[in-house]
């Protein structure tokens, strides 16, 4: 097999994905090994090429938050808050998966991770195919994650159909994996996005309801305010959520 390197024209890479092949794609974190995430046979190839254990699930790359309901049974407001703040970017949000997601992606579980990568070429590829990508890091299981197309080729030249050369990855570290499938939320994998940043965004998204005036006086009114305008509460809430996330982090 010849591994084709794509630079500016990604139409060939889009055809490979549509036809069930594998293409390594650039992101802001590390290169990913992408396949059509709705094609079970294509996803199986990822496991085979990487030597990835079958019990480890895969996340899906998506073009943005607008498609979250397409692949997840329920998307809580907090997940929408985080996707609005950090997508495209290095945050993978784990939610309950819809039955349309192939079992091989879920590795026997009932949740799926979604992430929108911050790289123009991969976003263009997602748009060109109209498909979600199952895309773990483009390295053999246990090896260092690649930060360039050359590093991908050193691993998989002749073993995958294509690689998109998007230059050197800016972050060079995997995305943070956050489970929001149930409460309390849990950090499943520490990554490029810190717990403090996640907590700060969650607090920003809160609406606090308080009461002004003594109870029963006839002067009681409802007060609603975003946490960002309530500095003392904001600081305490951010610290509390940060500590909770750190306590769950793997």
Predicted regions and their residues:
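Generic helix-packing signal
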Residues: 17, 227-228
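Post-Walker A alpha-helix
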Residues: 223-224
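N-terminal phosphate/diphosphate-binding loop that engages ATP/GTP or pyrophosphate donors
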Residues: 228-250
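Active-site-adjacent structural elements in enzyme catalytic cores
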Residues: 1-215
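Walker A/P-loop
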Residues: 220
């Amino acid at each position: 097999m010849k591994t084709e390197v794509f630079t500016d024209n990604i139409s060939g890479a889009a055809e490979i994905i549509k036809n069930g092949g594998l293409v390594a794609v650039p992101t802001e974190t590390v290169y990913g090994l992408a396949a059509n995430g709705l094609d079970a046979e294509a996803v199986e190839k990822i496991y085979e090429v990487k030597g990835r254990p079958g019990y480890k699930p895969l996340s899906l790359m998506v073009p943005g938050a607008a498609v979250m309901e397409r692949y997840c049974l329920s998307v809580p407001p907090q997940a929408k808050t985080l996707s609005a703040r950090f997508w495209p970017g290095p945050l993978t949000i784990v939610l309950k998966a819809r039955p349309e997601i192939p079992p091989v992606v879920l590795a026997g579980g009932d949740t799926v991770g979604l992430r929108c990568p911050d790289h123009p070429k991969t976003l263009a590829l997602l748009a060109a195919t109209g498909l979600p990508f199952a895309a773990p890091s483009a390295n053999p299981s246990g090896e260092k994650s690649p930060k360039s197309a050359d590093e991908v080729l050193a691993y998989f030249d002749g073993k995958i159909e294509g690689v998109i050369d998007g230059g050197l990855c800016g972050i060079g570290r995997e995305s943070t994996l956050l489970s929001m499938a149930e409460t309390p939320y849990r950090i499943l994998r520490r990554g490029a996005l810190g717990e403090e940043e996640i907590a700060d965004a969650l607090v920003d998204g809160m609406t606090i309801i308080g009461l002004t005036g003594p109870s029963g006086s006839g002067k009681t009114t409802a007060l609603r305010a975003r946490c960002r305008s309530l500095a003392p509460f904001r600081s305490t809430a951010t610290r509390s959520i940060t500590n909770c996330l750190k306590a769950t982090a793997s």
